[in-house]
Amino acid sequence: MKKNYYALAYYYLTRVDNPQLEIALHKELFKDLDVSCRIYISEQGINGQFSGYQPDAEHYMNWLRQRPGFSNVKFKIHHIEENIFPRVTVKYRKELVALGCDVDLTTQGKHISPKEWHEKLKENRCLVLDVRNNYEWKIGHFENAVLPDIQTFREFPEYAERLSKEHDPATTPVMMYCTGGIRCELYSSLLLEKGFKEVYQLDGGVIAYGQAVGTGKWRGKLFVFDDRLAVPIDETDTDVAPIAQCSHCGVGCDTYYNCANTDCNNLFICCEDCIDSTKGCCSQECSQAPRIRAFSPSRGNKPFRRMHLCEQVECEQVEKKASSCCCSCSH
């Protein structure tokens, strides 16, 4: 397939006086475009993940940069074959990154470019801190990075407190990174509040590093919050050796699935052989659960985010057997 679509990752912290207006304008614009997205807007700014047919994506980027306050938005672009989100989602979220605490965005770490980051890694002088969730860094991270065992963004403030006790903030330089950069905008401020004097953040995140440097000091793949789930950071180097293992047999693997037990639905890493033999379940216990989603190898590892998606798949399967479907879900 030709890669006629763009995947866009972007954020911009700026004062937005009327977030609801920006949301409404986004939704109106997208009505006639071949796009899908997950975009959050608040008084703090915008945080977006977007996919679209190339001309429509170009139109959106130009349109957003013409909106008051958004002229300096930087988009990180990947070439893809199709839309990677299930629908258009544009909504208000008070916290662009759900930390659960107030953060002083006027004090942040020093932004360094991907190439500066690459050179600084060679010095081996700083504590390299991965501020993503554990299921993200499990399949890919920088060499020798500190990998916090956290499962949600809200756990980072507590981790920052522990870090300040494990390392002397006055003498420990920190280099932090995340997927696209927005988490570091907030997390670097937290570390500065904890007394760390020298805090650097990778400008544009791992995505920008891959585009500017290539694989470099990165190992494995990058977890992304869309239908792809895992991608090489360098589009020209797709033969990436896995650093994770199948949760069932231990073979090298970096493919995530949602457990077919709809009451579990947890992400887990699994190889092709085991996902087939376990019918898509993460454990023996889940394979005996009362509500198990029919596993379809042809669907691949496309994520299930909500129960209604399970119901939709069931309806699609019924449609193949009958000329009509009487269910209430949309197709």
From Swiss-Prot:
SUPFAM superfamilies noted in UniProt: Rhodanese/Cell cycle control phosphatase
Record bears the keyword tRNA processing: yes
E.C. number(s) listed in UniProt: 1.14.-.-
Active site: C178
SMART domains found in the cross-reference section: RHOD
Enzyme class at the top of the EC tree: oxidoreductase
Classification via CDD domains: RHOD_YceA
UniProt cross-references to Pfam families, sorted A to Z: Rhodanese, Rhodanese_C, UPF0176_N
Record-linked HAMAP family: TrhO
NCBIfam families, per the entry: PRK00142.1-2, PRK00142.1-3
Family stated for the protein in its record: Belongs to the TrhO family.
Function, in words: Catalyzes oxygen-dependent 5-hydroxyuridine (ho5U) modification at position 34 in tRNAs.
Designated name of the protein: tRNA uridine(34) hydroxylase
Species name: Chlamydia caviae (strain ATCC VR-813 / DSM 19441 / 03DC25 / GPIC)
